[in-house]
Amino acid sequence: MQPIRYRTDLTPYNTFGLRAQARAFIALEHADGLRDIVRLPEFDRDTVLWLGGGSNILLMQDYAGLVVHMENKGIREIARSDGMVLIEAQAGEIWHDFVLHTVALGLSGLENLSLIPGTVGASPVQNIGAYGVEAKDVIHSVRCFDLDTETFVTLSNADCRFAYRESLFKQEGKGRYVIVSVVFALKTHFVPNLGYGDLAAKVAELSAGREATAKDVSDAVCAIRNSKLPNPNVLGNVGSFFKNPVIGAEKAAALLEQHPDMPHYPQPDGSVKLAAGWLIDQCRLKGFQIGGAAVHGRQALVLVNKNNASANDVRQLAQHIKFTVFARFQVELHAEPNWLPASFSL
């Protein structure tokens, strides 16, 4: 276990690039070190921050508790049968690197989730998703350290209670389970999922008449994302800032009467998912800026750190977007990233 560092700058550890410091900071390189961390005098399970890639947090002020940076690495195959492979990745693995690793192995299932920022450990928490695939579709199980019992436990896919951008780890399990690794069930044969947006056309372009592969899909997703989304290493951001709102069928029908071209996606339960980016774009908010925080000029769903944005700049901008969209569509937007501390959330 690495030594504790005090008054540590967290700017490099959050992709929006908000300036904040941690009172205490420690890097976790091996899951077994959790047993030592929980016995540190600086440890308080009510205030500790388990930090991965920092791509889904907004640090609104200095962090008064202990920050544990998950740096445990490792990928291994644990089972193979009937065209399916179970592959385990440690929580500290960079998500995109892991996806590329599985594609290089000839496995299928994660290619649509290419280039999503963050680490493997965050994928079940947020139930990350893109281009018609969600983490829940490929997660077999999640290995955790249970802070209640101070033991390692394995939670099945069903145990995780996945929903749209939700999971057990954001609800009842928040503050109890520390994710140390995730097991994914991937296919040895390629099963394309090309029904979302312009993905099929891009894959066809890249495959140039031959049979498409998982790598073609991954490359297509990367090309599309790079054309629309800013690189957080160049322009600070947390990816999609708002969740796509889900509304009732009756309300959706009323909106479609007023806006026939509105993108909408009927759900199995009868509700309808809308595109938050389209709603924001219709309010002509692309490029809108408050202080150093701005709506990205090409993708309305992304807020960026354009010029040393303060936490207050980000909050005011997000609040303005929420109010503007609600005033026009009577649809409420909810932020995807976690506000820290939570009292700042809108």
From Swiss-Prot:
Single Gene Ontology BP annotation: peptidoglycan biosynthetic process
Documented EC number(s): 1.3.1.98
Pathway assignment: Cell wall biogenesis; peptidoglycan biosynthesis
Matches recorded under Pfam families: FAD_binding_4, MurB_C
Subcellular location(s) per record: Cytoplasm
InterPro entries: FAD-bd_PCMH, FAD-bd_PCMH-like_sf, FAD-bd_PCMH_sub1, FAD-bd_PCMH_sub2, MurB, MurB_C, MurB_C_sf, Oxid_FAD_bind_N
Annotated active site: R165, S240 (proton donor), E336
Cross-referenced SUPFAM superfamilies: FAD-binding/transporter-associated domain-like, Uridine diphospho-N-Acetylenolpyruvylglucosamine reductase, MurB, C-terminal domain
Reaction(s) this enzyme catalyzes, per UniProt: UDP-N-acetyl-alpha-D-muramate + NADP(+) = UDP-N-acetyl-3-O-(1-carboxyvinyl)-alpha-D-glucosamine + NADPH + H(+)
Sorted UniProt keywords: Cell cycle, Cell division, Cell shape, Cell wall biogenesis/degradation, Cytoplasm, FAD, Flavoprotein, NADP, Oxidoreductase, Peptidoglycan synthesis
Record's GO cellular component terms: cytosol
Major enzyme class: oxidoreductase
Record-level Gene Ontology MF annotations: FAD binding; UDP-N-acetylmuramate dehydrogenase activity
NCBIfam families: murB (TIGR00179), PRK00046.1 (NF000755), PRK13903.1 (NF010478)
Function: Cell wall formation.
HAMAP family, sorted: MurB
Sequence similarity: Belongs to the MurB family.
Protein's UniProt name: UDP-N-acetylenolpyruvoylglucosamine reductase
The species this protein was found in: Neisseria meningitidis serogroup C (strain 053442)
